[in-house]
Amino acid sequence: GGCTNTERLVYTFDPPPRPVGRRSGGTRPPLNPVDPTPTGGLVGRNGSGPGGSSIFGYRRRTGVVRAPLAQPNETLRALNLEEPRNGERSEVFCTKVGTTNPDEMYIIGAHMDGHGFGEAANDNGSGTAIVMELARIFSAPDVQTGRSIRFVLWNNEETGLNGSAAYVEQRRERQGLEDPPGSGRYPEPRWLGMIQHDMMLFDHGAPGPDGRVSRDQRPEADVNIEFQTDSALALESRDLAFFFKSANDAYATDYPAAVGPHMTNTDSTPFMNVTPAISLRENERGMHIGAGWDPHWHQPTDLYVTFTDDDFRLGLNAAQTTLAAIAQLVDATVSAP
């Protein structure tokens, strides 16, 4: 059967109130150094990013647009006006049940919330589309998998990974339990790995000294696969990341993949001390996105019309990468018509 066994995880979104920060007086320090590097370069090492990353080169200021009038489109302005409210939330998932090992699964995820008064096209309509397309492909009636695959669309990522953290909290202790006993049913198969997709389209290179980023996808664009060295399962996650790179080497049509050790700020993070966990992105989150390489990140310009076919093709190659890797890991077969 297909991925029709849709379920929901219900949780309570109840963070403490955000502190109202006082703006510090004076001017902010310059984003980029004014003096040359010790070796005479114009710009070099330029601070640290999240996840243990180091930033090199020119940076571009980043942040979340919260001003409604920054979005000229009235429909999008209205769509973005709702602020996160504490209360009950849910997120949807479905499962391709394995034929030989239904009690084991890989989790494939993306977050479906967004902010910044845009359309959330890249962050994270792009990752959401990949998960839905992979669910469609694997759910074809002529596709069998030995192991199970769960496709999850997280909520509340932008507010602090709340939806994925709730999933881990509620379900980690239920892994591999047959319920009811003797039924052959496993509501929460044992986690073999978690793969997150978050911002898949835009790899136009570093900003220049004027803060501008190229309008075009760069010739060196690639799919960035990240694991986190500072996690309990770093070695297993590293192996999973390189397995995905080898799948890209074998099957991607347009763009290669690169592996980095600083996975951060996305829904694979709550999983990383429980199961091997990786993220796929347009750039490394710490040293690239964190340095302002994507000028549409959390901005009103994160719109479908912003991105080109070359941008969308990078997302497609990430989908090819995950499809090829997971198909091998779950022993997928296609029966003859």
PLM regions: where:
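Solvent-exposed loop/turn segments at secondary-structure junctions
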Residues: T12-P16, T99-N101, M112-G116, N155-G160, ...
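Soluble non-cytosolic domains of exported or imported proteins
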Residues: P102, A121-M132, V143, E158-N162, ...
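Active-site-adjacent mobile loop/cap segments within catalytic or ligand-binding domains
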Residues: F202-T229, A258-A336
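Alpha-helical metal-binding/catalytic segments enriched in His/Glu/Asp
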Residues: V92-C94, I108-L161, T322
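Sec-exported extracytoplasmic/periplasmic mature domains
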Residues: G1-T4, E133-V143, V168-L177, K245-P256, ...
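Second-shell loop/turn segments in exported
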Residues: R77-E83, D113-G125, L153-W154, P181-G182, ...
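Metal-dependent peptidase/peptidase-like ectodomains
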Residues: W154-D267, N273-A277
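Soluble metallo-hydrolase cores and metallopeptidase-like ectodomains found primarily
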Residues: C3-A120, A140
